[in-house]
Amino acid sequence: MVFIMSVSIILLAHAAFQIRGGGKIIYIDLEEYSDPVEKADIVLVTHSHTDHCDPDKINRVRNSSTVLIAPEECRSKIGEVTPLKPGESMAIDGIKVKAVQAYNYKRFRSPGKPYHPKGMGVGYLISVEGKTIYHAGDTDFIPEMKELGTVDVALLPTGDTYTMDVKEGAEAALAINPKIAIPMHTWGKDTAEFKKRVEAKSSTRVVVLQEGEEYHLD
C-alpha cells in the first residue's frame, strides 16, 4: 500500500494560518478572529502584537504535547515558549522550523521608532514533506529575503501601514521567487494589483485565499 502525503494551507484570518502536513497540525499567528478547531502539534507566533498572538485562541488548541515557538516577549501573554532567534532552527518529528528576520526600517509609530524594530519579531521557514513555507511576519521588504533559499510558498503581508504594501510585497515575491505567493495581512485591501505585478514578471503563481479557504500543495 502506498501512502500519499500532502501539505495544505488554510487562511484562518488576517495573518493566521493552519498548515497540515507530515501528520501534524501547525498554527501560525492565531488572533482574535481566527477560529481554530483542531488541537495543535506546533504553534508559531511571529511577535506579541494582539493581531498575531491571542492567548485565548492559542490556549484553545494547546495541549500538554504542543510545541509553542514564539519570541521571549510573548511569555507574559501565553506562558512558557521556545524562542528562536533569526538563524536558529528546531526539528519536531520531521518538521523543521527556522526563524528568520522580520522588521520595519521605513514604517514608524513616531520619529525613529519603527512599528516592528529589528529584534522584536521573526518570520518562519517551515519545512514539511519536502516543501518549504515562508511566513514573513510583520515586516518591510528587507534584504534578508533574498537569502531565504528555495521557498515553495511565501505568505506575504501586503496591507501597508505596519508592513509591506502591494508594490513592496510584489518586489519581495520577485526577490524570493517562490512557486506560490499568498497575500496576507491585507486589511481588506484589493490584492489584484499584487497578483498582476508578480505574475507579469515571474513564474510565481499568486493564490488569493479567502478566510477559511484551503490550498493544497502539489
Segments predicted by a language model, with ranges:
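Active-site-proximal segments of metal-dependent phosphoesterases and phosphodiesterases across multiple
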Residues: 147, 153-175
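Core dinuclear metal-dependent hydrolase active-site scaffold
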Residues: 2-38, 81-149, 164, 210-218
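Divalent metal-coordination and catalytic microenvironments
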Residues: 19, 47, 97, 138, ...
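Binuclear metal-ion centers of metallo-dependent hydrolases, dominated by the metallo-beta-lactamase
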Residues: 9-10, 82-90, 118, 170, ...
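Short active-site oxyanion
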Residues: 62-67, 131-133, 179-180
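Catalytic metal-binding/acid-base residues of hydrolase active sites
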Residues: 49, 74, 103, 140, ...
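Active-site metal-binding motif and surrounding structural segment of the metallo-beta-lactamase
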Residues: 31-77, 150-155
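A short acidic, amphipathic alpha-helical/loop segment
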Residues: 56-61, 83, 144-147, 168-172, ...
